[in-house]
């Protein structure tokens, strides 16, 4: 079994179902079974312990259920205590290693991010965060050994991770907005529209925004549908959500990718806040509490953004090589060297904050944006004012 061909940087990716001409299935049940057992071997070596707890979740892809069954079987055959979280976001799966209600040793997310419906993949987490490229190579080596001995004491329990994760986000909003009149409903009077792209992000409407008093009318594509019938599940596909914000006269729009590790925003005028603008907005939020911090971005950011960061926000801007893990790892490295870096972000919408485990979490970024929008709303201002001095290039072309 050639598992190496399934590695895509720090992820596993492959064709999971037939349906696209010329694309045969590569991410088989046998492959994910072996990868699951390889992950167990990786964790046992790292933590030097036999008894492990591992959480598993998935996005809305049509192949998720079948793959999950094979992965769970691999974990159970290794004697693992499995926590089946069902529909989840990629960042919430890491948080299953953090939350007191879970305290997992590791987590597996079944997702292929924004790729077409016939693709799927796996992301792996331990208590330190997402596994990197070299970790995946080690995991694959373990998985290819195929000399596994089945154990008898594995088990499976089902738990609602998204509800715990949503409560975490709600408490953050209540605390940071600190509404003087309606503390428990800090988003009262605000109209916030969400486009979940038929991925896993619909929970943000009914589990986060609505309980806090937000009017979410006009929100679209909230139902999980792994065929992605409305638009590609990518926060860079902005036209539909921009139109919806204008039509519904919303104060703010939020769009997620399939597994909610990326997000972008729309201001009240229907203007997209994506690519260079989402970097600028995230930096503006961070620099209020951390003046002069270093913002690490991918290399394709514009000169206009660089000027905004350094000469308007007065933070340091470091362009680094592309790839969200590269950008995050560089920010982590800077902090270890004593250089404060609070934000690592790609123009694609991958944003990781130091205050949040350097986890690239689209819902956490959206939450920070919602908090600031709510505070500005109380003061009679709007979010677009934060980046009004950002100039845009006359033409953007990626080579």
Predicted regions and their residues:
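An N-terminal, well-structured beta->alpha segment
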Residues: 1-71, 77-78, 154-189
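N-terminal small/polar loop signature for handling phosphorylated ligands or for N-terminal nucleophile
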Residues: 41, 53-119, 170, 207-266
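Short glycine-rich phosphate-binding loop at a beta-alpha junction
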Residues: 49-59, 83, 191-193, 293-299, ...
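Active-site nucleophile and cofactor-binding loops and adjacent substrate-binding regions
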Residues: 82-91, 272-275, 297, 319-322
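Glycine-rich phosphate-binding loop
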Residues: 105-117, 245-267, 272, 318-319, ...
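Gly/Ser/Thr-enriched, mixed-charge loops and adjacent short helices
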Residues: 118-245
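Phosphate-binding and adjacent anionic-ligand microenvironments
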Residues: 290-399
């Amino acid at each position: 079994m050639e598992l190496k061909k399934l590695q895509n940087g720090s992820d596993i990716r492959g064709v999971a179902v037939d349906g696209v001409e010329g694309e045969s299935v590569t991410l088989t049940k046998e492959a994910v079974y072996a990868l699951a057992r390889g992950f167990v071997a990786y964790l046992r070596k790292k933590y030097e312990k036999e008894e492990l707890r591992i959480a598993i979740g998935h996005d809305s892809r049509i192949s998720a259920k079948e793959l999950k069954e094979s992965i769970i079987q691999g974990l159970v055959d290794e004697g693992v205590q499995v926590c089946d979280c069902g529909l989840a976001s990629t960042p919430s799966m890491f948080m299953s290693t953090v939350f007191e209600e879970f305290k997992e040793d590791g987590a597996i997310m079944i997702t292929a991010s924004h790729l077409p419906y016939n693709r799927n993949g796996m992301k792996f987490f331990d208590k330190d965060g997402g596994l990197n490229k070299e970790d995946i190579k080690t995991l694959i080596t373990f998985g290819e050994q195929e000399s596994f001995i089945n154990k008898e004491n594995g088990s499976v329990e089902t738990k609602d991770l998204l509800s715990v994760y949503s409560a975490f986000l709600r408490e953050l909003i209540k605390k940071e907005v600190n509404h003087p009149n309606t503390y428990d409903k800090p988003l009262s009077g605000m109209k916030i529209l969400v486009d979940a792209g038929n991925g896993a992000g619909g929970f943000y409407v009914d589990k986060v925004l609505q309980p806090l008093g937000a009017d979410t009318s006009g929100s679209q594509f909230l139902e999980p549908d792994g065929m992605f019938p409305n638009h590609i599940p990518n926060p860079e596909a902005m036209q539909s959500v921009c139109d919806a914000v204008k039509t519904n006269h919303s104060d703010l729009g939020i769009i997620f990718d399939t597994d909610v590790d990326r997000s972008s925003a729309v201001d009240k005028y229907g203007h997209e806040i994506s690519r260079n603008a989402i970097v600028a907005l995230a930096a503006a939020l961070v620099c209020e509490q951390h003046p002069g911090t270093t913002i690490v971005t991918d290399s394709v950011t514009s000169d206009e953004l660089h000027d905004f960061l350094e000469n308007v926000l007065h933070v340091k801007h470091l362009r680094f090589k592309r790839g969200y893990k590269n950008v995050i790892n560089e920010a982590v490295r800077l902090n270890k060297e004593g250089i404060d870096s609070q934000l690592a972000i790609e123009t694609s919408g991958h944003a990781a904050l130091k205050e949040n485990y350097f986890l690239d979490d689209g819902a956490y970024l959206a939450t920070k944006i919602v908090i600031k929008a709510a505070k500005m709303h109380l003061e009679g201002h709007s979010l677009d004012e934060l980046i009004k001095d950002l100039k845009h290039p006359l033409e953007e072309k990626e080579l």
